[in-house]
Amino acid sequence: MTPTRKDHILAIDCGTQSVRSLVFDPRGQLIHKVRVPIKPYFSPKPGWAEQHPSYFWDNVCGACQTLWRERPDLRSTIVGVALTAQRATMVNLDAQGVPLRPAIVWLDQRQTEGTEPVGGLWGLLFRLAGMRDTVRYLQMEAEANWLRTHQPEIWDRTQKYLFLSGYLTHKMVGRYVDSVGCQVGYVPFDYKHLDWAKPSDWKWQAVPMEQEMLPELVPPTEILGTITARASEETGIPSGLPLVAAAADKACEVIGAGCVEPDIACLSYGTTATVNVTSRRYVEVIPLIPPYPSAVPQAYNLEIQIYRGYWMVSWFRREFGHREELLARDQDCVPEDLFEQLIEPVPPGSMGLILQPYWSPGLKDPGPEAKGAIIGFGDVHTRAHIYSAILEGLAYALREGLEQTEKRLHVSTNELRVSGGGSQSDAALQITADIFNLPVSRPHTYETAGLGAAMDAAVGLGLHADFTTAVTEMTRISRTFEPRPETHEIYDALYKRVYKQMYDRLRPLYEEIRNITGYPPK
């Protein structure tokens, strides 16, 4: 049916694996979408992850132009545009707005040694609080510190230092402006007050830069600008349409899954697996690790993440799933569908195989010495048990994170919503329900990040009065997985008596491995 009303929203989702252009109506119905796969990064050196900023923009343009070719009737129905993008991918621009080097993608692992410690009163306070190592780690991780140390000629020419969202926004509206909801990374941002840090804040010492290098910030739901004639020519988006501030991809997933109240937690089963709770109160679950800006104005996402989350499914597929990859080609399906069949006979607990999913080190708990572990092997175990243990281990880790969050926030969770690629797995969602002992719901659309961005636009443009209305009108549950009491009993015992003991018991061994092998580097 050809749309006649001008009340549709174009959401652009620039993720890690693909760029999507999506058209939603005010009911949250996905009218049409185009997905363009992208190469996440290239690696000039081991551990580096970079991509040309123009590559992202070209694929945004391609996704939009393909959308208009496939559905030319939709172009005249668009009332506004919203953008969501991967977090913590950094772009350096010169005085003409031209990228000076490839973007450093969030998956990059380089670190900077020898940064100047935070001094003065802040340095004394961190020393007294035992937080110096945490601040040092943040300094080592900051891309700006690496650029200033190793590519000073680039840093000296940098006029604007932007997240990918800020770069794409500039390409669309011609202004150096970005959403508050996209500020997730190593820049001098005040996460409590949702603005650039005050001049006296320690972050300007930890990551030195001029504030003029950073964009103007606009809260979610407010207008970033209007689509320029040049952007219209390149994307096909009608010029003059408003670009409404949304948020980073994880934040948009949270509201797209309907999680705007603290008793409904959002699990994101993506490359990085996270558990998020939306709160109007600023609470640091881990000291000095702030909650991130929500896609809801003046709210926060309390987030615990497993850096190598459902990346582990890709790891299993690459290392152990060759048979399923071949069969999937013959059966015209994806290997993950066959993995579901593979683990059907595996009992809860994977016959004693327990996995700790720290394939990448952490900051506090797990710490920088952490490694992944699988314990409990016997001669009965097969690939199927390993795959099942991956799904269980990720759910154990996220349950531990949610329990930390509940303790700090003094709120009990009543329901879980799941987004991300892993949300399409019935096995993963049933395991999650059984481990958490909570109902786990799959939203009506897989495109929760794009939907969340569209919800920001819908509220900002007055299609819905507020987020309570937007959630009611635009989000729905497709299927709910209820916990099974007898299965939860097994998982609960394994979680409390085995999984939660693993890290503290293995930590000294991880430290010895690190001392002997030098990996992960100190």
Regions found by a protein language model. Name each.
Residues 14-16, 27, 127-248, 313, ...:
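Gly/Ser/Thr-rich active-site cleft segment
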Residues 9-13, 21, 77-83, 161, ...:
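Short glycine-aspartate micro-motif
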Residues 28, 51, 79-85, 104-107, ...:
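Active-site nucleophile and cofactor-binding loops and adjacent substrate-binding regions
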Residues 60-79, 151-155, 200-210, 233-235, ...:
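Phosphate/pyrophosphate-binding loops at sites that engage ATP/ADP/AMP, CoA/4′-phosphopantetheine
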